[in-house]
Amino acid sequence: MPPAAVPAQTPAVNTPAAPPGRISPAELALLVSVFVIAACGLVYELAAGALASWLLGDSVLQFSTVIGTYLFAMGIGSWLSRYIERQLVAQFLRIELLVGLIGGLMPAALFLAHNSLPADAGAAFRVLLYALVALIGVLVGLEIPLVMRILKRHFSQRWALRELVSEVLTFDYLGALLVALAFPLLFVPHLGLVRTGIFFGLLNAAVAVWVLWLFRGELRRFALHAAACAAVLGVLAVAMLGAERLTTWAEDSFYGGDIIVRESSDYQRVVVTAGSGGVRLYLNGNLQFHSRDEYRYHESLVHPALAAHGAPRRVLVLGGGDGLALREVLRHPGVEQVTLVELDPHMTRLFASHPALAALNGGALASARVRIVNTDAYTWLEQTDETFDVIVVDFPDPTNFSLGKLYTTSFYQRADRALAAGGYMVVQTTSPLIARKSYWTVVATLEAVGLSTTPYHAHVPSFGEWGFVIAGRRPWRLPAALPPGLRFLTLEGLPALLQFPPDMARVPAAANRLSNQVLVHTFEEEWGRVQR
């Protein structure tokens, strides 16, 4: 038998709370709504921060500004709630529907906007991002005071003010705690950001429907409110059903070409395109390689260090889960074992099993000489007691502080301890032309831990001028020979890679340390100028 409707509004009476008894369905609905409000509000906040980090870089800055905007907007909403004096339940229901609709569709809207706007329209995307975050914050800020006032007005005999505030805030913080754990561990890995947003929008709308039914005796224009609930639920349900198609269409528009892989791991969005021009790998929307010229990058990264060593037997590759650096390392017949430390197991599985991708790396990931360790390189270096003749560091660019720590003195000290006597480490170090100071910051960081450095660069058409640094306890010398079959690197051409024209020449730069992470800020600033 359905619960009875709540009687029409009665005047509030300032009396002590009644003895504890069985909670009514209406009270439960309102307290559950507080739980859902907190959970959904935090999800929308986290989704906006995650999207901003993926699409704009610098996760600390993006999450800080998104959270700050959201909390400030909640304060505005709470202040504005004083001006809502009548029809509290109806106003709460409408706000709940708006939060569900706007918040639920926000990740999809931001994703579409980013893929539809021109590359130089970053400011327009930021305006949309913070406008949506602020709007949701204001609406959520309105809801909690309204719930308290509804509970106090309808159930004044049961709730003393101190108990009311305690109960509401308890449910509020419980909702925030549970979703903070479930968002990264459950929802995003299994639903993705777009469908996670829509799912929680549906939760908001479901609470609105429950409130509509329980307070039907008080609500004016019940049919109109019911139609609004049905409309919001319908829009969100259609969006949920079409979320995959929406994501596919947006990615097709953004990347162009034929997408042969579109998958999400626990760490990143992986997209691989194939067309007449070749195969491209994108991680979180950033190009990682193009098959038509990646050999220039990987030959330049690997062979100057390995060939100069003379007799490398044990090699460590950090990053490079696509296996392309491994392919070049395995050209050296004297190498007995290569250890690949790659954070994302999805990457190594994909590039080992997908026929087109495994063909690019020559099946390197399946080689008997290769040992794959899927873990964080920083932690692994801290714990290992192994040593290696050559260490190849092939991490993504330092676009955020998580990646930036892999370019710090602390990291290079750990790597130095893993170098065997006479060994070399080689690091990819972004573009010395576009990010000149960033490049020389990496060089200065390696030198700050006592290593001798040899900076060099190569032209990779997909990226332009790209930089590398060889570091070790002994100075680097030009090798006597290179492996056969290389397509770009030659002994005669190596000296030219060591020459830096005036627009790439060394500039003063401080070492990048965990305590300052200057490289992330410098990198963001320099590449930001190119994108504006």
Language model feature labels by segment:
Residues 1-461, 466-475, 527-532:
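Alpha-helical transmembrane segments of multi-pass membrane proteins
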Residues 474-532:
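SAM/dcSAM-binding transferase cores
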